[in-house]
Amino acid sequence: MIKNGTCPYWERDDLSECARREYIEFKFPLFILLTGMIYAFCKVFRAFYLRGKNHTNEAPEFEEQGNGNHEYARFSVLRLKSAWESRSFCNVNNRSTFDKFKKFIEGAFIVLQLTIHLYILSSMPMDNKKFFHQGFLVQMFLWILLLVVITLRLISASQSFRWVLACKRDLWAVSFYSYASLFTLSILPLRSVFIGKIKDKIMVKYIISETFIDLALLLLLSTSSIEGTRYSFLVENENKKLPPAPTVFGLLTFSRIDRLIWKAYKHCLGNADIWDLDINNKSIAILANFEMSSKKGRLLPNIICYFKAVFISQLFLAFVSSFLNFVPSLLMPRILSYVNDPKSKSWNLVSLYVSSMLVSKIIATTCRGQGLFLGEKGTMQLRTVLISNIYSKTLRRTILKDSTTSLQKNASTSFEENPDSSEAEPRKKSSRKDNSVNNVMSIDAFKVSEAMNTFYLACEAVFMTVTALMILYSLLGWSAFAGTFALLAMIPLNFWCATFYGNYQADQLILTDKRTSGISEALNSIRVIKLLAWENLFYQKIINVRDGEIRLLKKKATIFFLNHLIWFFGPTLVSAITFSVFIKFQNQTLTPTIAFTALSLFAILRTPMDQIASTVSLLIQSFISLERIQDYLNESETRKYEILEQSNTKFGFEDASMEWEAAETSFKLKNISIDFKLNSLNAIIGPTGSGKSSLLLGLLGELNLLSGKIYVPTVESRDDLEIGKDGMTNSMAYCSQTPWLISGTIKDNVVFGEIFNKQKFDDVMKSCCLDKDIKAMTAGIRTDVGDGGFSLSGGQQQRIALARAIYSSSRYLILDDCLSAVDPETALYIYEECLCGPMMKGRTCIITSHNISLVTKRADWLVILDRGEVKSQGKPSDLIKSNEFLRESINNDSKNTTHNQIDLKRSTTSKKTKNGDPEGGNSQDEVCAEVENFEETKMEGSVKFSAYKWLADYFGGLGVVFVFTSSSILIHGITLSQGFWLRYWLDTGSSGSKSTWLYRIVEGHSNIYFLLTYIIIGLVSSFLTSGKVWIAIISGTNVTKKIFAKLLSSILYAKLRFHNVTPTGRIMNRFSKDMDIIDQQLIPNFEGLSYSVVVCLWIILLIGYVTPQFLLFAIPLCALYYTVCTLYLRASRELKRIDNINISPIHQLFAEAIKGVTTIRALADERRFITQSLVAIDRSNAPFFYLNMATEWITYRVDIIGTLVLFSSSVMIIMKAS
């Protein structure tokens, strides 16, 4: 009996009447009344006071000052958010009509409760039962408060009470809090009624009616959409599918995804079937919030600051879940005591213990699911933050002169594992190779984001360890500290393993960078590789780097084996030491009740030990990847927004000296002073290597300005510019010497974000000599150009890049030798009709060229460069008279092109050349046919058996897999024998003897014999289990080596047609993220699956052996488990496939941004490309988000089924005992 003064809390097997009246009926309802009333009053008063005032959550405006803000305007997500919202369709997921009708039912139930209380209160005899009267009065006032609350919720739709909307969610929270609290309080009185402790008929009817009305109200609110929350969705079109409005029940049990899972069960899912993300999970909202909460500095503190609310929530949920997970262990000694002696406790009390086990496990499972889902949602958000920051950095990063190496250099040195340190070190310090940036995004960003899942597991592990040790101390006394010290002694071993694992991981990532960089270079140069038959050379170089990766993977497998061995053998060692101290030094009797309760705690301890080991390992990998991301984000950025000065009258240089950032050569542009003529054609000539391209890049602000000034018409973002009356904007367009095209159609590449005007488009196509080519293509302007223009000839690529600059609304054009890849006749036509034609009216054009006679023919201003210096400049006619070298160069060019003079009519041009390419270029029949735009597809339905057999064949066949699985059954049988041995030891009664413990003889054996055998069984089991894992990983590593070699060979030796229609980003996704999954997740996950299946089968067999009646429950539970798993497998399979497909466009965007960053920045089009990346990220996040929700959906249900197994087996055991 538990007492509190004169009022006992508990009487034998039930709550006392005094406690029920004082606490259940009075004090707790009074607390609910006061807290609910104060909270509701404050929220309603605030809403009423602030009525009519406009409060928004808009981001604070920033002051524009200094040149640095031009960069902020281009890259700030806060600036981008408003533009995004204005262009997107905002849909609100409103409450259904049935949900609104439920509120009237809710009000009717509240009125019914008030009526019942008034009736009982009026008919109650006035006596000295103070708490009885007070309790009814308090509860009546509480129901009056809830009636007021439901009334306010009902009238919130009225225009006269619109201010109530501001606190509608708070009012709903008060109702839910009250219903849930009252129903919880009514459970114990209802139990008292069922076991016959309450005899009064009126009270019995009252308690039953109150409980079921409270339950009805709670169910009404739990299954209705949450009020006061607008779930808005920013989508590209109004037909995008939206998820159902969330309910409390749906959020807690993840039932919100039921419809999607059922749809996936009936037919295959596509991108159109995936629900959109609500606005709070959109990348634009995530980044805007992150930007507002972040400060300049390292990434880690900003991440912690942004996710602090998530961390605090996970900390609380982990605490609750960890404590409740031990409730079955705390109740187990009492249940076992009843099993040993049914007369020691009443059936009612033991049934309460079993029910408490069920309830505690359900609540613990719910808390754990919510904590893990918070981590998974945080993973998605952190991944969004990292990928977006890396992409934004790519658009801001300084370009390097040596960023693009020659193919010969790549073939000879790119894959060397130990390059000369004298050459490698400066490069390492200056910048990461462009081709390895994709690796930072695809591997490092994902590894860092996965660390969000580990925080909850780490907190849970710490809480579970502390709680288990506390319970062990209460059970075993100070001998539990002996086990604790043994546990602490293992921590240095874990950290030692983690340190080595981290070092190997860092080395592996370096080799992965080299591998992906080499593959990217090979894909970008695949035409030349096939032309020179270098496939075998590149294959061997990449395989050599891959072999280094495989060696490191095997070293990591060895460390994993040691860590696994510590994890498995730890509980055995700890339990052996604890039991030894308990028996020998404390001189206590080790009974089966104590032993198996302690063993259950040690078994629970194994989970946090595993979590700590895996968490440390994952955190080390994450910190290594985070450092790599931080190093990339710390790389030097372009200073163009600082060095360029805006001027409406000047366009050029004033005594400017410039150099390349981190250049390997000492080349500089020295003392450049040029004032380009506005609304004119300006030409720059000079010998090869004189600095013409560097000069144009300097004008764009891409070089490092050492001294002087650079004047440009604008430094503002493209979206912020105003269109003039002539349709032009005061901006620049750039056409590089090497044409840069995006994967898309010809129209996409030419229009490039501008408003499409068919007449203007046709004029540009004609002036750039593209109209004949387009007519020859089946799809016309909708023809896909392939990855980076791969399907087009060099001349076509350059003319499309030129057409993009001409079609743009920019008033200033910067063209870098844009006619070098076309034949002389086409070059002359483009020069006359395009660069000197009506398309250039009112525009300023700066062009560099080696064709001196062509560009000087009609140029208004000529600049001659030599060795980085301006030798002369002026009108071409004046320079020709005064410069003999220029005069001779023009005469030589004129002699060479005399026989190519043509009539400027288009008919003659098309007869002499194909595609406008120089003689010997790719023919139109070869490269200009319509290129189909193949979208990445996915398999449908279940994974075919042939796929499993294909993987099994790499292992050595299905026989090897069968032997491996069978060994798991045998090994776990050995593990279970340890428990049987302990039971046999205890049944011998050896611990009850008074003789010397170590040499006590029972049935011819001493206690040391039993103890050593117990330890040996645990050690053998641990070695076999860990060895099986090690063999599996080593074998899997050899398998991944073969798979990679097969994949690489297929790609390198594929026909050009395949490369024409397959974007590089899609291929890189296979070699980066997919290969990383195969390397590090496939085999461990398979081994974990086989282990779990074996353990599950053994548990069912053992429970069935001990309690055969359990099999009656096992059959429906197994059927339920099969149904749940079948539903999940189909949904998860489809979602994983879609998720994997939707990542490829992100890879493609990165590849395009790396190649075309100069063009993008010149066009001031960074904001549009960032928007495209955010759309791609959202497209990838949607299936990832719902895949995680589906994972928690099945995890929750499987845990509930496991809880039902525990509950049903416990019921069978106590029924058998009674």
Curated annotation (Swiss-Prot):
Record keywords: ATP-binding, Glycoprotein, Membrane, Nucleotide-binding, Repeat, Transmembrane, Transmembrane helix, Transport
Keyword Repeat: yes
Topology of the protein relative to the lipid bilayer: Multi-pass membrane protein
UniProt-listed InterPro entries: AAA+_ATPase, ABC1_TM_dom, ABC1_TM_sf, ABC_transporter-like_ATP-bd, ABC_transporter-like_CS, ABC_transporter_C-like, P-loop_NTPase
Skewed-composition ranges (Polar residues): 892-901
Listed GO MF terms: ABC-type transporter activity; ATP binding; ATP hydrolysis activity; ATPase-coupled transmembrane transporter activity
Record topology, Extracellular segments: 1-29, 125-130, 191-201, 324-351, 471-481, 580-584, 975-1013, 1106-1109
Segments passing through the bilayer: 30-50, 104-124, 131-151, 170-190, 202-222, 303-323, 352-374, 450-470, 482-504, 559-579, 585-605, 954-974, 1014-1034, 1083-1105, 1110-1132, 1198-1218
SMART domains attached to this UniProt entry: AAA
Domain ABC transporter: 651-892
Binding locations of ATP: 686-693
Topological domains, Cytoplasmic: 51-103, 152-169, 223-302, 375-449, 505-558, 606-953, 1035-1082, 1133-1197
Record region (Disordered): 410-434, 892-926
Compartments where found: Membrane
Family: Belongs to the ABC transporter superfamily. ABCC family. Conjugate transporter (TC 3.A.1.208) subfamily.
Protein name, per record: ABC transporter NFT1
Organism: Saccharomyces cerevisiae (strain ATCC 204508 / S288c) (Baker's yeast)
Source taxonomy: Eukaryota, Fungi, Dikarya, Ascomycota, Saccharomycotina
Name of the gene this protein is made from: NFT1
